[in-house]
């Protein structure tokens, strides 16, 4: 699944959220297999499917960097990537962003955006997904709270990412 949208007030537009709320009905995206919370965050009905978010921003890339004024784009979109896409089991690819979209005016800039998108799509089925911690992978023994021994130095959103350097 590819979701493409402009970033509006630091999130997806309301119409996209409305679509998710209507399509992700009980028994499908949540409440899967008799409604228990056993099959979620990596193990839902969409396990094995891939998802990619292509977002267009008004500001430059620097605004969405690790120390940018708007905050990292990956963290801004965490409710979508981790919540709406990973929750029902999808392998979520790193976000593709077109920054300063409204200011792309020359043919060269347009071609650069198109070229970057082509390259991104070439890896749609081979690129590594975001290494979110799965609910049933051992890091959440009660399915709700991360075990104390798992990345004790991390809190917040980054704690939900597997530290690949430790593996």
Located regions from the model:
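Glycine-rich phosphate/pyrophosphate-binding loop and the adjoining helix
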Residues: 63, 67-167
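Helix-loop-strand module that forms the ligand-binding subsite of alpha/beta enzymes
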Residues: 1-81
